[in-house]
């Protein structure tokens, strides 16, 4: 169904645009992957392994896991994200989520998390804000173009948490392309592992054919190549981040505590915290 809205277009008469909205109960085998020229609203869940692409926004009521989401607008996750490092979420605008755990989130503007980010890769062109509720960033790799705000960074367990701020637009675009390539290769890698696992299960049941054995050999070679490629992409990303010259006005604001194990980088300068801090020195 289309939703009407009045455009701010400057003319003698207001122009009415129709914004396409697709509303679904779930995204699963009954719907298949979704690629829609407007906004997609999912009232319940997106089943693991499925993709949702939208030229508008994506709004999902329940927690997402191993899914691929890409929107040219914003992404709103009412239930949060637990992608277990095998899903990928990208918005040209902003991402809003209740929490993120072992997730990869990339936003052109901002990432806004209500409760906590745990062991996640967060990348935003402008800002990352985790201030409501617990307001904690625990573990993971967090990169923001201009600013980061949180209540707490790290934990008393000295969980390694890396924060980088002050990324110029050109470098951010390179990181975005690199991350997209990494996630694409990782999806292929997981498919290869799944196929190998299926052959191993067939062998245990005594049903593996000679063709299966030959296929496994080829898959093992592909697995090794993909592992090296993924490792190389990670190294390239590390080098790119290490070469960043921070933009003017980049800032990190922590309202309560910075724990040991946290690294904060403004470009090439890295500050490591070995003792607990109740305020973040400038």
Regions inferred by a protein language model and the residue ranges of each:
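Extracellular/lumenal glycan-associated surfaces
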Residues: 145
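Hydrophobic alpha-helical bundle architecture
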Residues: 111-114, 127-137, 149-151
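Conserved short secondary-structure elements within globular domains
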Residues: 123-125
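Charge-rich, low-hydrophobicity low-complexity segments
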Residues: 1-108, 113, 141, 151-152, ...
């Amino acid at each position: 169904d289309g939703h009407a809205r009045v455009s701010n277009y400057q003319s003698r008469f207001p122009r009415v645009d129709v914004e396409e909205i697709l509303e679904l109960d779930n995204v699963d085998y009954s719907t298949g992957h979704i690629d829609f020229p407007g906004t997609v609203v999912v009232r319940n869940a997106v089943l693991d392994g499925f993709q949702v692409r939208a030229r508008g926004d994506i709004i999902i009521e329940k927690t997402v896991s191993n899914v691929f989401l890409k929107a040219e607008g914003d992404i709103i996750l009412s239930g949060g994200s637990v992608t277990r490092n095998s899903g990928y979420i990208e918005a040209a605008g902003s991402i809003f989520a209740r929490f993120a755990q072992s997730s990869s989130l990339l936003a052109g503007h901002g990432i806004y998390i209500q409760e906590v980010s745990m062991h996640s890769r967060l990348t935003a062109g402008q800002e990352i804000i985790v201030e409501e509720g617990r307001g904690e960033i625990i573990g993971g790799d967090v990169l923001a173009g201009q600013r980061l705000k949180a209540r707490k960074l790290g934990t008393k367990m000295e969980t390694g948490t890396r924060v980088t701020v002050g990324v110029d637009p050109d470098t951010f675009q390179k990181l975005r392309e690199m991350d997209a390539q990494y996630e694409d290769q990782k999806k292929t890698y997981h498919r290869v592992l799944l196929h190998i696992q299926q052959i191993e299960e067939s062998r245990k049941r005594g049903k593996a054919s000679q063709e299966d054995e030959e296929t496994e050999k080829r898959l093992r070679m592909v697995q090794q190549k993909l592992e090296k490629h993924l490792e190389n992409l990670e190294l390239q990303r590390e080098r790119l981040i290490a070469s960043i010259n921070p933009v003017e006005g980049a800032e990190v604001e922590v309202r309560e505590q910075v724990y040991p194990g946290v690294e904060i980088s403004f470009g090439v300068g890295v500050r490591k915290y070995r003792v607990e801090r109740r305020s973040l020195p400038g």
